[in-house]
């Protein structure tokens, strides 16, 4: 296996046994690919902006004299880059410019003669851009657009499962769902009539739709029924016999032909009878005349002589009618064939309840239902019906919809057609009737072949189209308004509706969410989330159990584990590790192809629909060397059912064991030993882990950690290979390898690192270089670690030495006992950065001012502010301190003469402004790390703003100059190489000024051209540098575009250091969560025979009932890993030679049956030394999910580390020194600190604000509210008979306004008496009763 440069520094021992056929695909591709499709120009016009434009344009005027045509579009360059957008609070977007052509036709000339053509580029608003990490920056905050799982367009056949009608009869229905347009439903009622609904409105008999399509009764009957022919032959009645139709009937007369009686009267017709009739070729039998009575005629029978209708189509035949028919000479009669078994008379019955007689009456009926109250006209009715399903503007099935529709009704023409036609409607009705007759199956709505993914690109395109349609109406009107000679396309288009639609979608759609940025994993999982909620999706209340449940087709597509607990369970899912979307938006998952019983490395992606046809083996099926299956019978899946299949029948095999689960779930080692409910909590809690101060890789991982860290985009990854030229805290410079150069560039890559910035969740984002100058790197290598990454691996928590034992009740009910050492070593210390904003506005009474001159504030409170009234960087502040001084003018009050006199003498001061400074919130204390001042264009900048500006300019200049010098150096080195090969000596060049090298001449023409090219590049580089600096300077110095009425914004960034403390929530990766109950001194913690104390004590009772045994295995394996580290440390202490180390390491990496081949011999001495250095803390281990380390391997590793194979040690009590009576499981578990910190939750109130109506204290920390003393608490005091306490609770402590004011005064005076009065809420109750017209008065006790 080839290890990349960073991987060699610390090789994970892999316990996986299955070979890796397929690497995990790029994790964010679902977002990036979808958006690229939307943005990039598609010549076919199938997707994205192009499709939206083509669907709306050309726009014709109402009178047809002119039209506006679409030519092409282009996207400009963004004004600010991503970081600048975040700082300034603006949207990262590109301007959209569209080339339009206005064509004016000549009214007087024949149609289509062009009078004038004008072309122009029109600005059509801004299109937000996706960053490289799959997010959008909207108004300065990073947001994610979650993909939506919605019902695919097409036709669905379903039943109510007998729930609608009391009889329990199953009613079938069919629904045609377009991508946009009206829904068309067909449904049976309990009487077996077939009805139709349009857009879920009132139902009409379904034959109305057929009549509206111009069908007569005869044609309708002809389409839906088989016929039976009767012939009248001299007083007898002969019936045409199709033997198959007799199945299951009881003969009402002797069935005989040619003198043979086949079935006697009253006998049931069996299959044997039918075979006999078929064999003898009986095609006509004589029937009694009564047999035809009650049968339904299939067409009109007319008396030729009089012209009267004897029997109409769909009318029952009676004896009189029969007599009339034979009189009129109708010898051949055609009736409908129906029976109760599989040819129901549904359409015939429906025709009887249908009141319409012809096309017009049917159209009018439909019009009345769609537009009740409007008088129908023939034209309006026709136009409405036409536009409902047959017009491309109003109705579109989309490619997906048409594909699903055709496959459902078995049509193979009309592949491109987006609208419905007559055939479609009739075929759907036929299929529905067939299902009612017992042929065919209803669809499963939760099957992933019937639900598709709508990603960012598609949703943005839909919103964009909505905006365009709004514009279209306005354009049509303007085109019809007379004189077009002076009009240009720009005058017709108003970009506001378009940008409003797009802005609304990105800013406030239910699926545009504030990115979860706790740690790299939470970012990745948020972008891979699939939601069934949102516009056009389900709602929480309506979603039943079936939709939320795991479906067999989720296998390898959606994760069965990772979903939120609570009301959204099952509605919000996560993409499985290898899943991807196909062109139609259906989820696919990869499988290895099996050819003639041999498993190949060829991989096919199958969607849920395709998968149903194959037999698929599991990833852990045993294989022989040659790729054939080892066992005769193999566990495999077919149509979602798991079972044993002979190996010859297998078509495919899973690619990997973690194919089923999502990324978060595949980060849980030994997932296979955990109960699913706990695994769900484990997967969800990893996303809440706060990045610790020092990231530490997990000793026991699953091998996916590197993928997450690299794909999440928090690390800095080499774009091209090369040698590290220089490294400092803020930038890394790489000299690119010769073979990866683009001709004519300097060959230097510069990576600027992010330092101490705030994430959406107020955690700290900081990148630290993990390479040294002179090191070689390859493309894709990690150069710098971000938050929660360690040497390019995801590191959400810390490896803690834990013991499973009770300890004095401090770990009762999932509490956690932590050693003081953990706090001292800052293992779980986290940094949180808060942004506090102060806005100075223009008010009616004058503008607010940011100043250090604040009325009635002492000197001490201003000590941390500079002269501009803004706090300086580095100040340590606590709750209540002023950060930005601000005063607001307040309204003139009427002054008394005395005050006027005083003001006249002492001048105006303080009376006309009030203090509205920005203060530190109460429970917060920390250090100021950054201040930013934004000033409106045209407002004078204060001193602090100018200082910041100067500093930024200096930084920008320094950065760009360094960058230029690096690039210049690279270029001049190449010049030097050319000159040296052209005959100049090293000494000569060293004495010449480097800039002059470019002016030297060479004999060799080829070299001279090369030199000239380099000189040209040098000039370009310089010009580029000047241009870059000018742009930077302009951006820094120009005024900011602030919201209307805002003059200045000051943003202050406050860093808070949070150590771990009792009340903080911690968790392992197996759903084992708990709250810290006590921080115990190290000397009191249990310790082992070597005197090493444990860090954390967990309760063993938390394991058996929760069935997450994975944590025990993790602890054992962690202990073994640490044992190997200790062994290496011992060898280092003994200063053994390198060969011994190589031998030991080889032994460790070869242990157990594993797919991993590590050849220590191929590493250089330096590399081995680095590896040893990184393994001293313990051997990192990968145990992939469902393919993890076996019990035997763990024991072997424990043995190699010199530890007991049971994984249990004798521990001694730290307080007494006595040994505990039985060995205790001790080991290393990876623990996370979750973002539920006690500091953010702890809250107490003395007095504060009250609710307006009830006058009771508000609730919640944000409102500085009180604790609710509810109904049950009142019962408790009543039960104790604590009458006075209860009275106090319900009056002065709550809503007795006078009482509480008095009480406050009394306490101030040192008198602790209380006088309870009438609670305000009681008055509210009285008012409410009076509002009902009941007079209620309070009487004093006499």
Curated annotation (Swiss-Prot):
Q: Which GO terms describe its molecular function?
A: DNA binding; DNA-directed RNA polymerase activity; ribonucleoside binding
Q: What is a single Pfam family found in this protein's UniProt entry?
A: RNA_pol_Rpb2_1
EC assignment:
2.7.7.6
Q: Does the keyword Ubl conjugation apply?
A: no
Against Gene3D superfamilies, the record matches this protein to: 2.40.50.100, 2.40.50.150, 3.90.1100.10, 6.10.140.1670, DNA-directed RNA polymerase, beta subunit, external 1 domain, DNA-directed RNA polymerase, subunit 2, domain 6, RNA polymerase alpha subunit dimerisation domain
Q: Which reaction does it catalyse?
A: RNA(n) + a ribonucleoside 5'-triphosphate = RNA(n+1) + diphosphate
Question: Looking at the keywords, is Transferase present?
Answer: yes
**Keyword annotations for this protein?**
DNA-directed RNA polymerase, Nucleotidyltransferase, Transcription, Transferase
Q: Name one GO cellular component term.
A: DNA-directed RNA polymerase complex
Against CDD domains, the record matches this protein to: RNA_pol_B_RPB2
Q: What class of enzyme is it?
A: transferase
Q: Which InterPro entries does the UniProt record give? A: DNA-dir_RNA_pol_bsu_ext_1_sf, DNA-dir_RNA_pol_bsu_external_1, DNA-dir_RNA_pol_su2, DNA-dir_RNAP_su2_dom, DNA-dir_RNAP_su2_hyb_sf, RNA_pol_bsu_bac, RNA_pol_bsu_CS, RNA_pol_bsu_protrusion
Q: Which domain of life is it from?
A: Bacteria
According to its UniProt entry, one GO biological process term is: DNA-templated transcription
State the protein's purpose: DNA-dependent RNA polymerase catalyzes the transcription of DNA into RNA using the four ribonucleoside triphosphates as substrates.
Family (UniProt) = Belongs to the RNA polymerase beta chain family.
Q: What HAMAP family does this protein map onto? A: RNApol_bact_RpoB
Subunit composition? The RNAP catalytic core consists of 2 alpha, 1 beta, 1 beta' and 1 omega subunit. When a sigma factor is associated with the core the holoenzyme is formed, which can initiate transcription.
PANTHER family named among the record's database cross-references = DNA-DIRECTED RNA POLYMERASE I SUBUNIT 2
Question: This chain belongs to which protein, by name?
Answer: DNA-directed RNA polymerase subunit beta
Gene name on record?
rpoB
